[in-house]
Amino acid sequence: MTVTYHEKHDLLYISLDDRPRQVANLRVDEDIVLDVDEQDRIVGIEILDASKRVDLDQFLTVDYRKTA
């Protein structure tokens, strides 16, 4: 699992499976998009306006990448 925060876009992405694959985007809420693979497994979670939706400090204990 990889957690990436894009500060410029305030986007938090949680990759549950880092293998390259084709995915479909399934919007489940105004600010939450799931990446679903061909077998309907969730392989990623995208949270838009992340700083408003989650406490980003929770992820300090997780090894995450911060990008510009």
Question: Where are the regions that the model predicts?
Answer:
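Small, basic N-terminal interaction modules of short regulatory proteins
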Residues: 1-68
